Amino acid sequence: EIYLIITAIMWSSGGLLIKLLPDLNGFVINGLRSVVALLVLFIIGGRFPKFNKTIICAGVAHGLCATFFVVANKYTTSANAIVMQNTAPIILLIITAISTRKLPKLAEILILLSAFVGIILIFFDQIGGGNLIGNILGILAGVSFATMFYFNGKKDADAHSSSMLGFFLSFIIGIPFYFSIETFGMSEILPLLGLGIFQLGIPYLFFSIGVKLTTPTTASIIALIEAILNPVWVFVFVGEAPGVFGIIGFFIVIVAVVVKILYDRKSVEKIEISQENI
């Protein structure tokens, strides 16, 4: 579990480091941090990515998620962006229901409605044009994040390969925007290196180790440390904070996600017990 805790803490630095790059376009930030992370995975991971349909789909979802999240941070608060991304378990419920053509259970529907209440409060908190765009991008990051989990959960998936593909796609998406860079000194290079090495590259290596040593439920809950710490770092060092409705919505969504994770664990345990009794 220590690997996952370290991963979540390192992930949580993303919002702060992005805010330290006010003069760079979000697409530029994401593209350049991703190419650094790609090099880290390749050098330390020591292998080329595998390719199949599932890995490509997961990789595309990963690249889109990273892009939406970074650009969202340019338009809304880090708290809003990160909590929208972490609606992934809730959104995954919808994706699963559509793919299996089965309605969610009543308890799942109640969890879903609770999460939507939190999301509405976040939108209501900062409804200005820029913030609205940021919140929408945050939701799209959540959809992409959930899609990535969906494909990485398949038998022929390979999270290491899809991560490398996602980082490469993020770099490609940023190409049209690299020409807009006006200033690029140490004040830009250091945060970008921090994002690529300490916020993306190394944490993904720790995550790949830690996720094998614990249950998916524990991993999911520990990962929420990122959602809580991310806005804390930004508030402490930059002074950015959401409004009252945003804070209330933030905690409603976090609680809904935790309840959903624990509900999934309980459902799996019931299935395992019933199979043992057969």
Predicted ranges, named:
Residues 8, 37-41, 92-93, 127-182, ...:
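Transmembrane alpha-helical segments that form core, pore/gating elements
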Residues 13, 45-80, 84-85, 117-121, ...:
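Specific transmembrane alpha-helical segments of multi-pass solute transporters/efflux pumps
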Residues 13-16, 36-51, 67, 115-130, ...:
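Membrane-interface helix-cap regions at the ends of transmembrane helices
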Residues 21, 29, 72, 98-100, ...:
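Hydrophobic/aromatic residues within transmembrane alpha-helices
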Residues 32, 81-87, 152-169, 200-236:
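Helix-helix packing/entry segments at the starts of transmembrane helices
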Residues 32-34, 124, 224-278:
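C-terminal-most transmembrane helix of multi-pass membrane proteins
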Residues 40-46, 88-110, 228-247:
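C-terminal transmembrane-helix exit sites in multi-pass transporters
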Residues 41, 62, 94-95, 104-124, ...:
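Hydrophobic transmembrane alpha-helices of multi-pass small-molecule transport proteins
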